[in-house]
Regions:
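Juxtamembrane intracellular "pre-TM" segments in multi-pass secondary transporters
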Residues: 1-3, 189-217
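Extracytoplasmic
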Residues: 9-43, 230-235
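Extracytoplasmic gate region of multi-pass secondary transporters
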Residues: 28-29, 211-265, 326, 330, ...
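Helix-breaking motifs and short loop linkers at transmembrane-helix boundaries and internal kinks
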Residues: 40, 74, 95-101, 305-306
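Conserved MFS/SLC helix-loop-helix module at the cytosolic interface between two early adjacent transmembrane helices
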Residues: 61-97
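Cytoplasmic helix-loop-helix junction between adjacent transmembrane helices
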Residues: 105-144
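Helix-loop-helix hairpin linking two adjacent transmembrane segments in secondary transporters
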Residues: 140-186
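A late C-terminal transmembrane helix in Major Facilitator Superfamily
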Residues: 334-370
Length: 423
């Protein structure tokens, strides 16, 4: 008989929403090439870049308000509203018959998924110990990786067996089913830590006057450009560079996001070990980011790999280490600002990611159409180390008033459940 902390059971259920989050989002990456071959309506890589840009603008604009909203109304209401809204967006995408209609629904998806990211961060902050938070973020990456890994086969299955519309309908149905599952779980396993009373918008937005938050935001724009590349363009890389069809590419690209989870898990484990050795959480996250950023430089060689198998391994290696970088970088705001403002502070990073992706999506499409992936991989390979250097210079290793009292709260709470080996 083994004892598993109940807080980890709750986090596992909550983070299962991340699977649906990226399933809804990443179906589009494969569908972009399916639409180009099925000719139901005219669709180009430029249109795909425009969809990514519109999604990202909505994602960025909504992010700061979504973080404040989740901090204000609480975890359960915030998560339920976000998931319900993205299910509606998925249904609308499935019912679309033109690029113009797709733009409307992908914008709504961007708004809703910004709230979902804030909710995941809130759950990690409320349920887990400070030393466990990077591992909690790594579990979130598992959900994102599974969703992104399943998405190519999911899109191909419905598009070639039934209709591409049903890929989005099915994703929406699964999302709606998650809401009662989480509400029931949270009833039986409440968070061990309750933050102070919700702050108003002026108090939350006052964080924008802190230079440390701006350093984290700019670093996120730099480091996560490579994440955006592989999350959105991996199928296109194999189709354009190695001349595969969309179904053939789907046999390879599912591997890339799953290795991202392994990278996030290792990144979380590195900082966990460093914290246990006596380093402050901030210092540990920064050290883990440095290790990952140095290894990501190998991305520059990915376009030189001669066949789809090696190219997939190269993309996977790159994504592995950028996710190790990401999981630690996204945990830094929780370490610095605490659980009570975790939704807003991490949403500031989500805002930065959205601004970055909306800015680069259309230029990326143009460069890919004209020059291929080589110049992009060469440029993006050095961006995570630039992001690390910015944080290293502007964010101190020891933050006054860092929140460590949560560990005492959790340890004094009856927070374990027993799972027998026969269950």
């Amino acid at each position: 008989m083994r004892t598993i902390p109940a807080r980890w059971v709750a986090i596992t259920v909550f983070i299962s929403a991340s699977i649906l989050n990226y399933l809804d989002r990443q179906i589009l990456a494969t569908m972009a090439d399916i639409w180009r071959t099925q000719h139901e309506f005219a669709f180009t890589y430029g249109d795909y870049g425009l969809l990514l840009a519109v999604f990202s603008i909505a994602y960025a604009v909504a992010a700061l308000f979504a973080g404040w909203f989740v901090d204000r109304v609480g975890l359960n209401r915030g998560a339920a509203w976000a998931v319900a809204l993205w299910a509606v967006a998925s249904f609308g995408t499935g019912a679309s018959h033109s690029v113009g209609e797709l733009l409307v629904w992908r914008a709504l998806l961007g708004v809703s998924e910004a709230g979902a990211i804030a909710a995941v961060t809130k759950a990690v902050a409320l349920y887990l110990l400070p030393r466990e938070r990077a591992m909690g973020q790594a579990m979130s990456q598992l959900g994102l990786s599974l969703g992104a890994g399943v998405a190519p086969a999911f899109a191909v299955f419905f598009s070639y067996r039934f209709s591409w519309h049903w890929a989005f309908y099915a994703a929406g149905i699964l999302s709606l089913a998650w809401i009662p599952l989480w509400l029931a779980t949270s009833r039986f396993i409440p968070p061990a830590s309750q933050p102070p009373a919700a702050e108003g918008a002026p108090q939350s937005f006052s964080l924008l006057a802190d230079p440390k938050l701006w350093a984290l935001m700019i670093a996120n724009m730099l480091g996560m450009a490579l994440y955006s590349l592989w999350a959105n363009w991996a199928p296109t890389f194999l189709i354009r560079v190695h001349h595969l069809t969309p179904p053939e590419a789907s046999h390879y690209t599912w591997i890339v996001p799953l290795t991202g989870y392994l990278g996030a898990l290792l990144g979380g484990a590195i900082s966990w070990r460093l914290v246990r050795s006596g380093q402050t959480p901030v210092a540990a996250r920064k050290r883990a980011c440095l290790i990952a950023a140095l290894l990501v430089i190998a991305t520059a060689a990915v376009p030189l790999l001669p066949n789809p198998t090696l190219a997939t391994l190269g993309m996977s290696f790159s994504f592995f280490w950028v996710c190790a970088w990401s999981v630690n970088h996204y945990t830094l705001p929780i370490d610095i600002y605490g659980a009570s403002r975790s939704g807003f502070s991490v949403s500031a990073l989500v805002f930065a990611y959205g601004v970055m992706q909306s800015s680069i999506s259309r230029p990326l499409a143009a460069v890919i159409e004209r020059y291929g992936f080589a110049p992009i991989c060469f440029l993006f390979a050095g961006l995570p180390i630039a992001g690390y250097l910015l944080v290293h210079l502007l964010v101190p290793n020891r933050i006054e008033g860092q929140e460590f009292s949560q560990s005492q709260l959790v340890e004094s709470t009856p927070s374990t459940c027993r799972l027998s080996s026969t269950s």
